[in-house]
Regions:
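Active-site neighborhoods and metal-handling regions in enzymes and metal-associated proteins
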Residues: 1-364
Length: 364
């Protein structure tokens, strides 16, 4: 049964007349067609007992057909009113759809209002956002194969990036060199902006690559990822240029112990919260707890941040096929930042990483 078939069965089981799917990641997951329509309307409509259809800007129609989509696709031109056309195509299948499912976390209020004006009797009673979060949380063998391929691309990027590090270069220089090497290799898209941070700049976990010059005797943090056939990689390594002082070495040692211990602990049957605690306890015991300022990990797949969330308070039981990051970090303002990250998938008795670049402290 395809993912689209599963959604159609869910729609039928929950007595809905129609499911309106508006999140472009959900659409890609169900149809194989990926596009961010920006201000235009891209939508998938699924019915319990009628064929689904895609509604898209006219300029996307041929690309949709090229994916192998074998159900109706309707295009619209920029001067047309998309929701009037959508209403027409829905009524061809159901003259008066009452029970609707929508993605609450994605559908904008203005589009919701237009939809209500077209279907004044509609009851938008099912939030599809958690439904798709649950569907996407367990990966298939095919999805894991794509994630492994993306991980191999990230490993290559690390090697290029490490070799590019030199005193006097900027963070941006290193990012540009590794991304250029990836493009020459046929990797056209990063999963997020490559992050290179040197020295104290790395103590800003959501900072950005900049023009900071790399100096000797500093730590350099890499956080990067690629997109392979719609699936992402995401990994972090921290390396040393020159000689480190005892504080820098200790921060790295503690962070590495937390990451390795958590990765060894990850398996089916434990809770997300307990996995976070394993890493956090190590960092707390070493005296750096106040500097570990984010959750241990986030789900990943087609999106950079999916479910599950590996954090305190999340009692979700880990299951085979779940994919997420394990990324403890220690960020001491004005001193240094260290983060070590692999994304993993849960197997029947443990977990396996998508990236394999060594996590032992590397001196360049």
């Amino acid at each position: 049964m395809s993912q689209l078939d599963k959604v159609q069965a869910w729609v039928s089981d929950h007595k809905l007349d129609v499911a309106y799917i508006s999140n472009f990641e959900s659409i890609k997951y169900l149809t194989g067609f990926g596009s961010d329509p920006i201000e235009r309307v891209l939508a998938l409509f699924v019915f319990p007992d009628h064929e689904p259809f895609l509604f898209a800007p006219a300029l996307e129609v041929e690309a949709i057909k090229d994916t192998g989509w074998n159900h109706p696709v309707y295009g619209y031109l920029d001067h047309e009113k998309p929701f009037q056309l959508i209403a027409k195509y829905i009524r061809e299948r159901n003259a008066n759809p009452i029970h609707w499912g929508i993605e609450n976390n994605n559908l904008t209020f203005d589009r919701y209002e237009v939809l209500r004006s077209e279907f004044p009797n509609a009851k938008f009673e099912q939030n599809l956002t958690p439904v798709f979060e649950k569907f996407r949380m367990i990966k298939t063998a095919d999805e894991i194969e794509k994630l492994n391929a993306a991980g191999a691309e990230a490993d290559y990027a690390f090697e290029v990036g490490f070799n590019a590090v030199a005193a006097g270069k900027t963070e941006a220089d290193v990012a540009a060199e590794l991304e250029y090497a990836l493009k020459k290799r046929g990797v056209m898209e990063m999963s997020f902006d490559t992050l290179i941070q040197v020295g104290a700049h790395a103590a800003e976990p959501h900072g950005a690559t900049g023009m900071n010059q790399i100096q000797n005797n500093e730590l350099v943090l890499f956080d990067l990822g690629t997109i392979h056939d719609g699936y992402i990689s995401d990994a972090s390594r921290t390396v040393a240029l020159g000689t480190l002082n005892d504080k820098q070495k200790d921060i790295y040692k503690v962070c590495l112990e937390a990451q390795l211990t958590a990765q060894a602990y990850a398996k089916p049957g434990i809770t997300a919260a307990s996995l976070d605690k394993v890493a956090r306890d190590i960092i707390d015991k070493a005296g750096y707890g106040e500097y570990f300022i984010h959750r241990l990990g986030h789900g990943m797949g087609m999106g950079e941040h999916e479910f599950p969330s590996i954090m305190e308070g999340n009692d979700l039981i880990l299951q085979e096929g779940m994919c997420f990051s394990i990324e403890p970090g220690i960020y001491i303002p004005g001193v240094a930042g260290v983060r070590i990250e692999d994304c993993v998938h849960i197997t029947k008795d443990g977990c396996l990483p998508f990236t394999h670049t060594s996590k032992e402290l590397r001196y360049l």
